[in-house]
């Protein structure tokens, strides 16, 4: 079973590896600038989490919690660990917290999306 640790500031010991995965996994136009990252981390409805499998970092999630539903803004699995079911496990655990959850997926319609 995956475990997760909440990251509440850029000073967190896990922030650097999360930020590196974030930069690799999402196109530049979907990424927050540094100040916007700090603001999101301080928002009470936002949760940035580092996910681990037996101590090995496997991915990240950035979720918002609202009255009655959750919204997954970012979800990424380390590129060296993809196709091993981690995304499915991570998503399943998030859904136990908020069964009604929105996961936005951008269609692969541009060269940058591919």
Task: List the predicted regions and their residue ranges.
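Recognition helices and adjacent regulatory flanks at domain boundaries
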Residues: 29-39, 51, 86
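A short helix-loop-beta-strand connector motif used in the catalytic cores of GNAT acetyltransferases and
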Residues: 39-50, 71
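Short amphipathic alpha-helix that is part of the acyltransferase structural core
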Residues: 1-36
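A short, internal acetyl-CoA/4′-phosphopantetheine-binding micro-motif in the GNAT/acyltransferase core
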Residues: 75-82, 107
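Conserved GNAT acetyl-CoA-binding A-motif
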Residues: 97-113
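Conserved acetyl-CoA pyrophosphate-binding loop and the N-cap/start of the following alpha-helix
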Residues: 81-93
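Conserved beta-strand in the GNAT
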Residues: 50, 55-76
């Amino acid at each position: 079973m995956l475990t997760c640790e909440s990251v509440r500031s850029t000073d967190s010991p896990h922030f650097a590896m999360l930020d590196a995965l974030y930069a690799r996994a999402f196109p530049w136009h979907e990424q927050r600038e540094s100040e916007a990252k700090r603001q999101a981390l301080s928002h009470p409805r936002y949760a940035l989490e580092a996910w681990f499998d037996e101590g090995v970092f496997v991915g990240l999630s950035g979720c918002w919690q609202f009255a009655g539903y959750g919204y997954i803004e970012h979800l990424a699995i380390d590129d060296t660990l993809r196709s091993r079911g981690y995304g499915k496990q991570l998503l399943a655990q998030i859904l136990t917290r908020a069964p009604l959850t929105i996961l936005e997926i951008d269609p692969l319609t541009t060269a940058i999306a591919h």
